Amino acid sequence: MGQACGHSILCRSQQYPAARPAEPRGQQVFLKPDEPPPQPCADSLQDALLSLGAVIDIAGLRQAARDALSAVLPKVETVYTYLLDGESRLVCEDPPHELPQEGKIREAVISQKRLSCNGLGPSDLLGKPLARLVAPLAPDMQVLVIPLLDKETGSVAAVILVHCGQLSDSEEQSLQVVEKHALVALRRVQALQQRRPEAVQNTSVDASEDQKDEKGYTDHDRKILQLCGELFDLDATSLQLKVLQYLQQETQATHCCLLLVSEDNLQLSCKVIGDKVLGEEVSFPLTMGRLGQVVEDKQCIQLKDLTSDDVQQLQNMLGCELQAMLCVPVISRATDQVVALACAFNKLGGDFPTSSFTDEDEHVIQHCFHYTGTVLTSTLAFQKEQKLKCECQALLQVAKNLFTHLDDVSVLLQEIITEARNLSNAEICSVFLLDQNELVAKVFDGGVVDDESYEIRIPADQGIAGHVATTGQILNIPDAYAHPLFYRGVDDSTGFRTRNILCFPIKNENQEVIGVAELVNKINGPWFSKFDEDLATAFSIYCGISIAHSLLYKKVNEAQYRSHLANEMMMYHMKVSDDEYTKLLHDGIQPVAAIDSNFANFTYTPRSLPEDDTSMAILSMLQDMNFINNYKIDCPTLARFCLMVKKGYRDPPYHNWMHAFSVSHFCYLLYKNLELSNYLEDIEIFALFISCMCHDLDHRGTNNSFQVASKSVLAALYSSEGSVMERHHFAQAIAILNTHGCNIFDHFSRKDYQRMLDLMRDIILATDLAHHLRIFKDLQKMAEVGYDRNNRQHHRLLLCLLMTSCDLSDQTKGWKTTRKIAELIYKEFFSQGDLEKAMGNRPMEMMDREKAYIPELQISFMEHIAMPIYKLLQDLFPKAAELYERVASNREHWTKVSHKFTIRGLPSNNSLDFLDEEYEVPDLDGTRAPVNGCCSLEG
């Protein structure tokens, strides 16, 4: 079945319930409630253009120009519109005065370009009306002199003076648009004035009959003058009634009508027959028969000249048999083209009903339209502009309707079908969306198809819809059965009759076809007109934008729902029960001294503390730093937060909770031993400590490059911004803060809350070593010139340095700890290397268990990364010297291990094996330490 139209007709026989929009699930992650979103404002430019588009007279033009300029320009105080009166005088009627053409005004008129100034000079001011525009004006005000040009004569046809404020770029653009539309409105008013004859004085014909006879007026002339005096309506139907009644009386015809010719000369239409206004306009094609030749030849014809098809069409329209007919072309003086056919039917008198129309009747009709034709064509032109105005307003309303249904594609498509059918007066409308190489329709006039088995799918290169989708061009088919692409099998099976089709493409902002709309059977015409094509083209733009944005909105929503669902699942498994935090706080917060007497010394190893005691140790450190009291943090909330953070860590060999605890403890050591409060604000130190706790949340044991190479979900979310894992860690921290009962910053002011989150983001992102290497030169410069507490950049750099030193703090402990940490790190690295090999990629040497030589890798890491960091710390804080010395000591240990295994060789092919053998390496104090990765850590 290769035709879109047929399928859509077939599916209209079933009614389908509308699809219900999916209900959002999950919890939204947010920072703090913002100000309410701004309400949409009215489109003042569109309103201004619509008002200009409706102008039909001078008074309306002046008012529309004033309203339009007031709508788009700032602080408009005065608008004067001067129109050409005679050959050179430019006159304003409100108040009445003539435009002085001197000074700035003369300059603008001669240059024929808009001019702005800070007021008019004395030479410009000839009277009181312009006195308020005298220079100098206020600094924020100006006078605009806007000449409107008549392109035919090349002269200025009107001038507008505006007293307003200074313009922005957007207001300048709006003014240019208004100028163009004002000129179009002026031309339209001038054209209407030229075509409309002066009103005939309402005097008695009988009273002036003798005078007109003396002037040589005939009886026809007097009747025509009387008729013209009655043609004051702006409605073309009323004008036709008066003219046709006159023609019926003068030609003795039983019926008279006007067959109006469409702009494309493809059809005739009739709304009035004699004294009767038809309920619906009757239209029929002009491509066949003698009536079409009349439009081309401009010659009168009678009944005997018509074809049988012509006669049948006219008899169907009149509802009676034709005995006689006279058809006279009505020619426009402006275009010299036939605009209508005046027809008289069945002449009374004489041998009625066989009487024929005479040359005198032909003269009567021609004489009538010689005087009334311009009135009729002007009124028809006015009605057309009114129709265009209504269509523009309808399109604007359609756009509003479409853009309020972006949340559901099916509802949007249903709205598109309804609006398209109403705009074009079509019997049926179908919309197909392009899905790869198929056109898919699941929304029809009858409703929405929920079951995929009922949706229509056709190849994108078959049938009428396929042709439009392939070419991207609109297709108007007057006779469906005569078109080679139409498949009439569906019509034969359903009994439906497809007469004509208008099929148009729907494109996105990149001019790519994303769908096709198909209108079937014009209701009030023989086929779809050129006007319908233009309307469909304009309508398709709104359709394309709304569909593209709706599909994008759907994808974003689906991604958000998945994210919310994943977040809900994670939070469910991380949920802290009331018993857990109650048990943690049962005996109050333990003093730091009770944990270990050396807890606040750099020599203390936090990994020696049992993991079950680490949550209390976090609370103890926060209390010792006085953050709980200073920021009035609720203890149950803090306990829940700490337990949630602990549960937020996975269990890879190294990047687990014990690593986060060690990093947090080192931050505490820096605070206690280096007196950080003399360098940083309290909120910065607090943010540093919380960031240490959260800096590796939900770490998967793989680095950023692996996330990008494996095209993981995290990479899709964050790769464009860089620091994939670090951004994920921060997002997880925000998710925990947004969990009920875990927001430890809940009592912060909005300003402090935002600053705390900004600090956490920057500090956590600083754990990416790539970031550290980018700012290393800035850190060196800061150390050279000395730290300046009043320099905000120094604050940011110091926080980044402190975070990195905390993250690598295991290197500042004893050799046993350093050796154990190396084992954990390389187990994690080798696991990633194995995954990369399984993906078909070649891992880095440090992650390849078959190639990595750990001692050399550790020496390189300590020389190029760790030691420079702690050297900078020593330069800024002399008390941190012991940290640098201990890192240097551990580097010497690795040098000796490397030398030993260079001589003796590795114990086996596995690079981790040497850490599991009982080799001894002389410690720096002369004792011998077993090189055993499983030995207990010093406490």
Swiss-Prot record:
Function: cGMP-activated cyclic nucleotide phosphodiesterase with a dual-specificity for the second messengers cAMP and cGMP, which are key regulators of many important physiological processes. Has a higher efficiency with cGMP compared to cAMP. Plays a role in cell growth and migration.
UniProt-recorded name of the protein: cGMP-dependent 3',5'-cyclic phosphodiesterase
Region of interest called Disordered, as start-end residue ranges on this chain: 16-38, 197-217
Disulfide bonds: none
Domain notes: The GAF 1 domain functions as a dimerization domain.
Pfam families, A to Z: GAF (PF01590), GAF_2 (PF13185), PDEase_I (PF00233)
Family: Belongs to the cyclic nucleotide phosphodiesterase family. PDE2 subfamily.
Every PDEase domain range: 577-901
Lipid attachment in record (N-myristoyl glycine): 2
Catalysis performed (reactions): a nucleoside 3',5'-cyclic phosphate + H2O = a nucleoside 5'-phosphate + H(+); 3',5'-cyclic GMP + H2O = GMP + H(+); 3',5'-cyclic AMP + H2O = AMP + H(+)
